[in-house]
């Protein structure tokens, strides 16, 4: 049996891709569900990428860069504290990778703490077209999603409760600080200066999400306005 396995995978340096390699109890539905919630940070980053590709919004790059810096900061803290995880996942777990195998603070929880805080502040300060209740609903949805991710890390025994609480708290702190720094950069006019660079203009990048965020209804109405205007212009040319 062992010789067969060695023949299939003879390379001793092959290890699991830890970002998507999640162990769960196959007889426990909640454990199965928690495995999917543990993938949420990857899905969020995929959303940022697709958001930028489709809309060319600079905000997608700004928040993704902040999340990346937050992730690096998490690695630094882990290698300083060096607190082990509550359960060992084997010698190959995050061994010889750029990520730390330590448990304090939880990277997933810190990611969601940053995501929740930064985007909640954005909702309350920039989304002028929403009333207070609507803002609370959006922020509450982010809070619920963050809770599910944090819970999954404890339930799957990747972290203990303290590691998750500290991780989320550190993420919330860095998210708030990053939001403040981005605000200062905007006030200084550096965002507009960046968007006016020739190489940036080639990508048609904008900052409309910050200046004038639109609702789905406004986007829909603007779409039909363009369609009707185009039809009118075509008709005028034929006449």
Swiss-Prot record:
Main localization is endoplasmic reticulum
Q: Give, as one word, the top-level EC class.
A: hydrolase
Q: In which pathway does it act?
A: Protein modification; protein glycosylation
Which ranges does the record mark as transmembrane? Answer: 35-55, 132-152, 165-185
Q: From the Swiss-Prot or TrEMBL record, state where the protein is found.
A: Endoplasmic reticulum membrane
What Enzyme Commission number(s) apply to this enzyme?
Answer: 3.6.1.43
Instruction: Name the GO cellular-component terms.
Output: endoplasmic reticulum; endoplasmic reticulum membrane
Point out the signal peptide segment: none
Q: Which GO terms describe its biological process?
A: lipid biosynthetic process; protein N-linked glycosylation
Q: Describe what happens without this gene.
A: Causes an elevation in dolichyl diphosphate levels.
Keywords, sorted A to Z:
Endoplasmic reticulum, Hydrolase, Membrane, Transmembrane, Transmembrane helix
- Annotated membrane topology: Multi-pass membrane protein
State which ranges are Lumenal (membrane side): 1-34, 153-164
- Variation of activity with pH: Optimum pH is 6-7.
Q: Which GO terms describe its molecular function?
A: dolichyldiphosphatase activity; sphingosine-1-phosphate phosphatase activity
Chain's role: Non-essential protein which is required for efficient N-glycosylation. Necessary for maintaining optimal levels of dolichol-linked oligosaccharides. Hydrolyzes dolichyl pyrophosphate at a very high rate and dolichyl monophosphate at a much lower rate. Does not act on phosphatidate.
Q: Which family does it belong to?
A: Belongs to the dolichyldiphosphatase family.
The protein's name is Dolichyldiphosphatase
- Identify the gene encoding this protein: CAX4
């Amino acid at each position: 049996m062992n010789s067969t396995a060695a023949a299939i995978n003879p390379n001793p340096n092959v290890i699991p891709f830890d970002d998507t390699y999640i162990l769960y109890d196959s007889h426990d539905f909640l454990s199965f569900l928690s495995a999917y919630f543990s993938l949420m940070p990857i899905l969020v980053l995929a959303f940022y990428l697709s958001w930028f590709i489709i809309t060319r919004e600079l905000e997608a790059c700004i928040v993704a860069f902040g999340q990346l810096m937050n992730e690096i900061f998490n690695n630094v803290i882990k290698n300083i504290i060096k607190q082990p995880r509550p359960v060992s996942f084997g010698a190959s777990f995050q061994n010889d990778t750029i990520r730390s195998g330590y448990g304090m603070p939880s990277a997933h929880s810190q990611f969601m703490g940053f995501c929740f805080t930064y985007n909640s502040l954005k909702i309350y300060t920039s989304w002028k077209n929403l009333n207070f209740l609507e803002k609370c609903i959006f922020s509450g949805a982010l809070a619920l999603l963050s809770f599910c991710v944090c819970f999954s890390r404890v339930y799957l025994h990747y972290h203990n409760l303290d590691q998750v609480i500290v991780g989320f708290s550190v993420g919330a702190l860095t998210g708030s600080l990053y939001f403040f720094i981005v605000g200062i950069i905007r006030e200084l006019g550096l965002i507009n200066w960046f968007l006016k660079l020739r190489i940036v203009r080639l990508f048609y990048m904008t900052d409309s999400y910050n200046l004038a965020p639109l609702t789905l209804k406004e986007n829909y109405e603007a779409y039909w306005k363009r369609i009707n205007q185009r039809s009118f212009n075509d008709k005028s040319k034929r006449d």
